[in-house]
């Protein structure tokens, strides 16, 4: 089966609509551009990172069914690639059912993973995968009961949030009401529902990037895996990641089994970020994102094809290569201030080591804990790579430029 791509901005163009235009989407756009795809990028605010490298950009409320449907009808894309959760998924289901475009990886996957309830019930209740104990709550009263039922300490997350927003660790009943209030302000959609999870005694967390792509000879969808990525979080937000993460053969086999089972259930082609807890040979499912994962930014330095190139190739029906060529790490660069018109200095010091690199995302506005860039580094060991990446990130100074 031949894969054909036309010419951007002409009638033969193969068009992709990206819903959500953050830093991960920016790298996806660049990968698609290199393969001759015409890219349309949408987000809720102007000048988002991926918009800056797309052929066309649009600002709208993607959670509004009317606005989203109007945009899709005007573009008539071949593929729709969601990058965030806050999308009117009922429109994507309608688009897929009417065969107006292909939703990546599938409308079902996007709908299930848009909130933690859908994917947790699929993983634990339908697929029988090992997870933490959990309860859902949609009121303060039911939340108090859920916390008591699960026990302390527990973890609380809005069912619709990302990058640690609204998440907290509740150590006792005295902290329950404050955790509820924090969860209500941190979710992407203020629907109130939260998940309360038991604390798992684990050694480390990994992201297992799992790629579903077509075999170039048979056309059958096959599953491939990148080497496991270790990561460190602060308040639920990724701070640094490294590849590979050492683990036992038994744990890696079980991690792949879990990732295979959940991604097959979600269907479609593309990359999935499967988050797992590891203790010895034991593995628990945590979450899955049907798109590139923030911890996977390390693959820009470690693999022949980064997670973004893998995603672009897989959704276009092209062969993929998940091989890692280097030990590498990534470290986040935060804004550290609430301001716009930012500048970044000491970049020459940050890049002084030949095995370091930077990605500055180009976000138009900074907040103290907003990711504005990432440093990557290669080395002989993960500890050395982590140290190099962290040093590079710390060299970067964020300056509030004059608005004159």
From Swiss-Prot:
Domain ATP-grasp: 121-316
EC numbers: 6.3.1.21
InterPro entries: ATP-grasp, ATP-grasp_carboxylate-amine, ATP_grasp_subdomain_1, PreATP-grasp_dom_sf, PurT, PurT/PurK_preATP-grasp, PurT_C, Rudment_hybrid_motif
Taxonomy, superkingdom: Bacteria
Gene3D superfamilies given in the database record: 3.40.50.20, ATP-grasp fold, A domain (3.30.1490.20), ATP-grasp fold, B domain (3.30.470.20)
Pfam family, one: ATP-grasp
Protein's UniProt keywords contain Cell wall biogenesis/degradation: no
Enzymatic reactions: N(1)-(5-phospho-beta-D-ribosyl)glycinamide + formate + ATP = N(2)-formyl-N(1)-(5-phospho-beta-D-ribosyl)glycinamide + ADP + phosphate + H(+)
Keyword Ligase recorded: yes
HAMAP family, A to Z: PurT
Protein name: Formate-dependent phosphoribosylglycinamide formyltransferase
Organism: Acinetobacter baylyi (strain ATCC 33305 / BD413 / ADP1)
Highest classification ranks of the organism: Bacteria, Pseudomonadati, Pseudomonadota, Gammaproteobacteria, Moraxellales
